[in-house]
Amino acid sequence: MNSTHHHGMHTSLHFWNRSTYGLHSNASEPLGKGYSEGGCYEQLFVSPEVFVTLGVISLLENILVIVAIAKNKNLHSPMYFFICSLAVADMLVSVSNGSETIVITLLNSTDTDAQSFTVNIDNVIDSVICSSLLASICSLLSIAVDRYFTIFYALQYHNIMTVKRVGIIISCIWAVCTVSGVLFIIYSDSSAVIICLITVFFTMLALMASLYVHMFLMARLHIKRIAVLPGTGTIRQGANMKGAITLTILIGVFVVCWAPFFLHLIFYISCPQNPYCVCFMSHFNLYLILIMCNSIIDPLIYALRSQELRKTFKEIICCYPLGGLCDLSSRY
């Protein structure tokens, strides 16, 4: 992270900071006509309280998801274990962004001697954010593969996706993503790191898209074939497709919330001096808000799509001071 910071500017990741602050370091250069000093080149300011508030909301929501999956044995299935991994990643991304707001505020208000320590703390947070981003993508891909197996390898599914194997997969995901996140921050001065991250993002999306095209095309054929059979197969197939649709919604929200940020990185690499690119990059803080909103929206999707999860949420909430409210609602 750069040692010079623009007041009030919130950033994420070491090289993301460089891309944002780069807008100001070259502010004296003519980047285009018709742009005033207070115009599109100024970073959109978002109050630090907004980041902290979103971080707290995400923390509470995703902890609720993790506790619910751990508490309810009916949710001890590969898909929900991968959802739990995704919830951890979402929580870390959002909480780290909120924490980095505090760190940057301290960095702007402390003396030079204390800044080096604050920068080191900020780099650690950046590593957590980067690792969590990669873990989010890998968890989504794992859920996609799991749904693929449930639909096309239903008879062998329980032999393929054992609890032990799922645990190994999740452990490997976090180990690889943690190492990659640390390396990305260490070598963040190189543009190749940004290109690598962009490539990973679009490669994973392409893999998930290819799985889904095949999944939904073949699933339609399977549904037609089993339509003449007794209802159990149809019910099971319908449940599997519901899980696939849930993941489709999760991926859609992920793309919508993260795409502006990755477009920001692409513009930083390809056209850092173009007036239109600079104008887009000046809204960097808004893209961070979208990323944090993704971490808040995901638990709502889980709850809306899973009756079992909603039931467990209610049981957990009723164990605490809201128990009286839950008892009242259950009577009506």
Curated annotation (Swiss-Prot):
Disulphide bond pairs: 40-279, 271-277
Binding residues for Ca(2+): 100, 122, 126
InterPro entries assigned to the protein according to its UniProt record, in alphabetical order: GPCR_Rhodpsn, GPCR_Rhodpsn_7TM, MC3-5R, Mcort_rcpt_4, Melcrt_ACTH_rcpt
One GO CC annotation: plasma membrane
Keywords noted in UniProt: Calcium, Cell membrane, Disulfide bond, G-protein coupled receptor, Glycoprotein, Lipoprotein, Membrane, Metal-binding, Palmitate, Receptor, Transducer, Transmembrane, Transmembrane helix
Subcellular location: Cell membrane
Keyword Repressor: no
Bilayer topology annotation: Multi-pass membrane protein
Glycosylation sites: 2, 17, 26
GO biological process, one term: positive regulation of bone resorption
PROSITE patterns attached to this UniProt entry: G_PROTEIN_RECEP_F1_1, G_PROTEIN_RECEP_F1_2
Subunit structure comment from the entry: Homodimer; disulfide-linked, also forms higher order oligomers. Interacts with GNAS. Interacts with ATRNL1. Interacts with MGRN1; this interaction competes with GNAS-binding and thus inhibits agonist-induced cAMP production. Interacts with MRAP and MRAP2; these associated factors increase ligand-sensitivity and generation of cAMP.
Membership in a protein family: Belongs to the G-protein coupled receptor 1 family.
Protein name: Melanocortin receptor 4
Native organism: Sus scrofa (Pig)
